[in-house]
Amino acid sequence: DLVRSRGLGDVYKRQELDNGQIVTLTADGYEVTTFTGEPAEATPFRVEWDVTAAEKGGFNSFMEKEIHDQPAAVRDTLYGRFDEQGALTLDELRIEESLLRSVNKIIIVACGTAAYAGQVARYAIEHWCRIPTEVELAHEFRYRDPIVDKQTLVVAVSQSGETMDTLMAVRHAREQGAKVIAICNTVGSSIPREADAVLYTYAGPEIAVASTKAFISQIVAAYLLALYLAQVRGNMFADEIRGVVAELQEMPEKLQTLLDGADEIKQLGEDLAHAKSVLFLGRHVGFPVALEGALKLKEVAYLHSEGFAAGELKHGPIALVEEGQPVFVIVPSKRSRHNLHAKVVSNIQEVRARGAVTIVIAEYGDEDVVEYANHVIRIPASAGLMQPLLSTVPLQIFACAVAQARGLNVDQPRNLAKSVTVE
């Protein structure tokens, strides 16, 4: 990119260099050429953002601010993506509907937090679209000889759009004939440019290394993609799609309700800041939330933490539980299918009986968990697939509070970079 500015807030117009181009700055301006010196044209575009997005806005850290940005981030991700009747209008996809109807497999490629967003999305895609969906770590994808062809849709998820492993996965997928859709937050970055289409999340700049609002926005964007596929392929009736869109539209208000009660979660983080290890348990869409909660604690608090599918507890992880061990449990709604709620309550009983300090994330009105919980964090009631958008937030707040209680820099954790641009 060519940048001529007194500060980041002045950068609204950008010229994106394509592969094989260089720019020469002069006193009179600039010149874009190829490596062989032939004149070339860079791609111009405008970046729409507010300088206040790069300020802390009264918070102690960017991570805190970005956690509190999430209601607006969800609202911005949804903006303009459906009409007054609730039908999806993802015109930016630029992929023929006939090709989307022919898709017989979806592969989501991503790394880190984005991969966990992809795991959440898999449940929605398979439920709404009835398309077999895999989630691959991008850095493993091309090394295991994946089965990819013209009927495969690859979805590449990256906040920065510059994650090298994900970019290489995109290139490999396209070489095999697959269509690639990017879900990205950074306009004009490499992955969207090399993909066949892109869904931008428009969550605004994320300064803190540990991703928060980008994660939530990636899930929302993936849900929009899933609904659009279901609409195009006829897997859902129009009123069903309208119902899900209405639930998504309610998320900003529900998220704000959670954030208004953040002080209690912060206090819990301060109280448990000296723990040696923390476990996170979840089932169904709660499982990737458990993984993300553990990752956040590792990233910013340097605290050993592990996320597990709650059903795996008896297959080994329960051996880690000892007296005073903090264990977070994400409890599905009592309305969930397959008796999942009762099974997770049973898991809470199991770890509590072995001396764990149980921190339970459950909906308002769920009294079944109270008897076995040392602490209950309440979230607003929602449809099952919407719950990750809510249950993730307390885990973000907790990780940030633990790190701050330990005197750590939550915005710039050691050994980590915001964008991993090497393999």
PLM segments and residue spans:
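Single conserved hydrophobic/aromatic residue that forms the stacking wall/gate
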Residues: 1-12
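A SIS-like phosphosugar-recognition module
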Residues: 14-58, 62-66, 72-423
